[in-house]
């Protein structure tokens, strides 16, 4: 077991999370900066999220207050209007947000056909899968075991449809990760911050 000093010296530390919410599209109008969880965006004085700028992430946003409803994963970058952060195009409502903890360089996830980790399964290690069908997995996804890393699952192939944040842990039923139906057809890793060049960490030469 490495000591705290060794752990801190052995890998770069993430920057503090930072996201800016603008009331209007294209980063116009009244704005508010967040550095931590926000259970109700309206309490910050922002009536409606028209655009989002993520300066250090990743984050997850929710359709409803108190982190409920449809989920939206935000990684470092610009989101000039609502349809740039929703892959379902079902709602333009963004009411609460929280930072996502990315604490592992390795990624391993197991998806199961039935609840309680039974039935046919598909194991994914350190890879993004845009289509489960192309990998020969035709089944529904009713339970998930995330052994390492942080992932986002999608309702449809090609990273489309409803998004489901999958953090380390066990999800015995699809409702545990917020899915109305046991339908997940693509999945990708969240590799932001210190381990991915797209993230907020910039190594020194």
Curated annotation (Swiss-Prot):
Domain of life: Eukaryota
Modification type N-acetylalanine: residues: 2
Region feature N-terminal arm, mapped onto this chain: 2-16
GO MF terms, alphabetically ordered: structural constituent of eye lens
Domain notes: Has a two-domain beta-structure, folded into four very similar Greek key motifs.
Known role: Crystallins are the dominant structural components of the vertebrate eye lens.
Assembly information from the UniProt record: Homo/heterodimer, or complexes of higher-order. The structure of beta-crystallin oligomers seems to be stabilized through interactions between the N-terminal arms.
Protein name per the record: Beta-crystallin B2
Species this protein is from: Oryctolagus cuniculus
Chain's gene name: CRYBB2
């Amino acid at each position: 077991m490495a000591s705290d000093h060794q752990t801190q010296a052995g890998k770069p530390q993430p920057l503090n999370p930072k996201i800016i919410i603008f009331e209007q599209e294209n980063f116009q109008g009244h704005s508010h900066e967040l550095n931590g969880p926000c259970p109700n965006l309206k309490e910050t004085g922002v009536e409606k999220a028209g655009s989002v700028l993520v300066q250090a992430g990743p984050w997850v946003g929710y359709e409803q207050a108190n982190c409920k409803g449809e989920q939206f994963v935000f990684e470092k970058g610009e989101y000039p209007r609502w349809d740039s952060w929703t892959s379902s195009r079902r709602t333009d409502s963004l009411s609460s947000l929280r930072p996502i903890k990315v604490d592992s360089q390795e990624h391993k996830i197991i998806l199961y056909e039935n609840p309680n980790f039974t039935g046919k399964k598909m194991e994914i290690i350190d890879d993004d899968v845009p289509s489960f069908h192309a990998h020969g997995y035709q089944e529904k996804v009713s339970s998930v075991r995330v052994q390492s890393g942080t992932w986002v699952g999608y309702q449809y192939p090609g990273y489309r449809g409803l998004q489901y944040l999958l953090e380390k842990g066990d999800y015995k039923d699809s409702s545990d990760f917020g899915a109305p139906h046991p339908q997940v057809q693509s999945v990708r890793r969240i590799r932001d911050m210190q381990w991915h060049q797209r993230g907020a960490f910039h190594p020194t030469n």
